Regions:
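Charged, often glycine-rich, active-site loop that binds/positions anionic groups
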Residues: 71-88, 142-143
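Active-site neighborhoods of enzyme catalytic cores
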Residues: 92-157
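Short, solvent-exposed turn/loop segments enriched in Gly/Ser/Thr/Pro and often Arg
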Residues: 65-74, 130
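Short catalytic/ligand-binding loop motif for oxyanion handling, primarily in non-cytosolic enzymes
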Residues: 35-36, 72-75, 135-138
């Protein structure tokens, strides 16, 4: 395991960084904040952070993004969530009210404490919420482009 001045670089992360072409790079991780966020979700971020640190150690420009899929629908009722929340099944997590009233939405109820944990761990990551990206029109151009090239995309996929 090599390291930069403050971050150890696991060997596998260095291999990943070495396999990438020249930057700039964007490393994206993410989850759907539909229930209590756990150590498995944290692993998602820490794997990305290891690759980011390996790229930085090589002098590469890199942007680290955590994508919170807040537009995902509520698919099931998480432990501790009132049973009457079944009425919100199928609704966007960003539009379901917070059951305790302490956050703006169901998604934020679970995402907020996770973001705080990342801050306390000094993980430097840009958190993006999918519902905000959609509402801002961020995906409009790429969606148009994808629709114009569906045949080519089918061949690739």
């Amino acid at each position: 395991m090599s390291s930069t001045s403050s971050h150890p670089i696991p060997g596998w992360a260095a291999v990943v960084a070495d396999s990438l072409g020249p930057g700039p790079h964007v490393v994206v991780t993410g989850i759907s904040p539909s229930g209590n966020i756990h150590v498995g979700n944290l692993r998602e971020v820490l794997v990305g952070e290891a690759v980011v640190n390996a790229l930085k150690a090589k002098g590469e420009a890199v942007r680290f993004v955590f994508h919170a899929d807040t537009i995902d629908p509520l698919r099931k009722i998480a432990p501790g969530v009132p049973k009457d929340y079944e009425r919100y099944l199928g609704h966007s997590l960003s539009r379901v009210p917070d059951m305790e009233g302490c956050h703006d939405s169901y998604a934020e109820h679970f995402l907020g404490p996770f973001e705080e944990a990342l801050r306390r761990m000094e993980v430097e990551v840009e958190v993006l919420r999918s519902h905000e990206l959609y509402e801002s029109g961020f995906y409009a151009e790429v969606t148009r482009e994808a629709l114009e090239h569906t045949g080519e995309l089918r061949e690739i996929l």
